[in-house]
Amino acid sequence: MTEATYYFIGIKGSGMSALALVLHDLGHQVLGSDITQYTFTQKGLAAAGIKMLPFDPANLKPGYTVIAGNSFTDDHPEIKRAKELGLTIYRYHEFLGKLIEGYTSIGVAGAHGKTSTTGLLAHTLSGVAKTSYLIGDGTGKGIPDSQFFVFEADEYRRHFLAYHPDYMIMTNIDFDHPDYYTGFEDVYDAFETEANQVKKAIVAWGDDPWLRKLKAKVPVYYYGISDRDDFRARNVDRDTKGSSFDAYFHDQLIGHFFVPLFGEHSVLNALAVVAVAHMEKLDAKLIARELGNFSGVKRRFAEKDLKDMIIVDDYAHHPNEIKATLDAARQKYPDKAIIAVFQPHTFSRTQAYEPQYVQVLSQADQTFLTPIFSSAREKTGKIRSEDITAQIKGAAVIHQEDMKPLLQYHNAVVVFMGAGDIQKYEKAYETLLAEE
């Protein structure tokens, strides 16, 4: 790849910022534009010295290669200007699809667990071989002459069909984007189409009934804890330090692995990593060493201590993710009360999953909901957070300007969950708690 100047429209997007960091590491000139409001991804961009400008068509110069975020339409002023200048314009997923061609590429797809699994795989392979990676939490690393390229593959709007990777891990199939997909069959169709673009093998979760139906040109290996899985975790042990297991490929013992992560899903994510490493004939002892020193990814069970409280920040916004996050909190802190603070994400999703939200949030010792976070595409809806709290014993709606109800808890765990701007509620609570 010859050196070029890449201009990102929407550089603070989580995938976009990660891709910007990868290209910067590989020696290219990188700059871009976005809203001026602070976004958690800009810390990494600023540390790399990557220029972030406010949107302005005058930013674009002859010779730039433009990478446009998927949320911007063709009539965006900067995209229009790029066309006037005759610049090459890629959409994010199109560019990533081209970039991975020079490596042994491993994508991670699925409705839930993508970012955690991508992060775990990137960390583990990096400790064993030269690895570039792009994670959906805004983290990206480009290592010149890498053997592996690990990336998160998002199924939204079928964008992942731009990818033809060597391997694909598929964590699960769920109807997670009711604003785009028509139902489970439609999502399955997208995954099966992608499966037929994979070059070497697919590693899929064995307990997913949809993934069990996959038909592909390459082998599909299933991972899990049941006898019918190809890659299997046995002798699973979960305690307050993390999770350990013996990994088998059919009847062959690959090795014993420990990962300092919590929740049932963490064992599955680690097993998927072991499966890919095994197929690439990497040393199991080195893989075990790297899994054992993993420290997690941004916004996935990120913890801090303040006063006598443990505060957890997590991106969970689908009922299955909330269930997994609360399960992880119970494993790590079996003797503490678990307080859930959840920001529902979009009216359509909240309405589609109302009974499931009631069920999973009832598993916390106490539940609070913030008002629903609306998206740019959908400003209002028929459902309110009060409709959910009314169905959970003792639950209430909490507002950023009054986080006092949380001050009644001591020596407990507060888990803030959501994909919107839940962090502003967490900050408001931390400020109150620190002053107390």
From Swiss-Prot:
EC number(s) on file: 6.3.2.8
Name of the protein in its database record: UDP-N-acetylmuramate--L-alanine ligase
Organism in which the protein naturally occurs: Lacticaseibacillus casei (strain BL23)
Lineage: Bacteria, Bacillati, Bacillota, Bacilli, Lactobacillales
Subcellular location: Cytoplasm
Broad class of where this protein is predominantly found: cytoplasm
GO biological process terms, semicolon-separated: cell division; cell wall organization; peptidoglycan biosynthetic process; regulation of cell shape
Similarity comment text for this entry: Belongs to the MurCDEF family.
Superkingdom of the source species: Bacteria
Keyword Cell wall biogenesis/degradation: yes
InterPro entries the record matches: Mur-like_cat_sf (IPR036565), Mur_ligase_C (IPR004101), Mur_ligase_C_dom_sf (IPR036615), Mur_ligase_cen (IPR013221), Mur_ligase_N (IPR000713), MurCDEF_pg_biosynth (IPR050061), UDP-N-AcMur_Ala_ligase_MurC (IPR005758)
Protein keywords: ATP-binding, Cell cycle, Cell division, Cell shape, Cell wall biogenesis/degradation, Cytoplasm, Ligase, Nucleotide-binding, Peptidoglycan synthesis
HAMAP family in the cross-refs: MurC (MF_00046)
GO molecular function: ATP binding; UDP-N-acetylmuramate-L-alanine ligase activity
